[in-house]
Swiss-Prot record:
One of its GO terms (biological process) is photosynthesis. (2R,3E)-phycocyanobilin binds at residue 81. PANTHER family: ALLOPHYCOCYANIN BETA CHAIN, PHYCOBILISOME 32.1 KDA LINKER POLYPEPTIDE, PHYCOCYANIN-ASSOCIATED, ROD 2-RELATED. Contains one covalently linked phycocyanobilin chromophore. It comes from the Eukaryota. Disulfide bonds: none annotated. This is Allophycocyanin beta chain.
Length: 161
């Protein structure tokens, strides 16, 4: 896992150069949004259960997926879906704090789509739930932090799609 600072420094180091204007601007932007990201992470942490509950209600609860024969039918499958959605919200929050998607590649997306496909987990419904979590989160943290978090929710969704 890296953060925005490490990514900028590593890119310059690989080229054997000092930071250029664009690199300095990336760092400046990262530091300027630091307080916003920390406040958003605190709000998400304090409301994670409510985010998951509302996202499930918006996206999955009343669809065919929860009826007998659906992929979320039985308590065990339903619990696994809730667990996975919580995992996505948590790791999207980590990525937002770091200002970098590498943790999502390393700890969430690497092999996940293949695993879901082999287990018969409906990827479309998973993406729908992630997008619902994005919407719920934005409502809690406000438009600026919501847009920032949206980057990481969308990254997960794209990686699964």
């Amino acid at each position: 896992m890296q953060d925005a600072i490490t990514a900028v420094i590593n890119a310059a180091d690989v080229q054997g150069k000092y930071l250029d204007t664009a690199s300095v601007e990336k760092l400046k932007s990262y530091f300027q949004t630091g307080e916003l990201r920390v406040r958003a992470a605190a709000t998400i942490a304090a409301n994670s259960s409510a985010i998951i509950k509302e996202a499930v209600a918006k996206s999955l609860l009343y669809s065919d997926i929860t009826r007998p024969g659906g992929n979320m039918y039985t308590t065990r499958r339903y619990a696994a879906c809730i667990r996975d959605l919580d995992y996505y919200v948590r790791y999207a929050t980590y990525a937002m704090l770091a200002g970098d998607t590498s943790i999502l590649d390393e700890r969430v997306l690497n092999g996940l789509k293949e695993t879901y496909n082999s287990l018969g987990v409906p990827v479309g419904a998973t993406i729908q739930a992630i997008q619902a979590a994005k919407e719920v989160t934005a409502g809690l943290v406000g438009p600026d932090a919501g847009r920032e978090m949206g980057i990481y929710y969308d990254y997960i969704s794209s990686g699964l799609g």
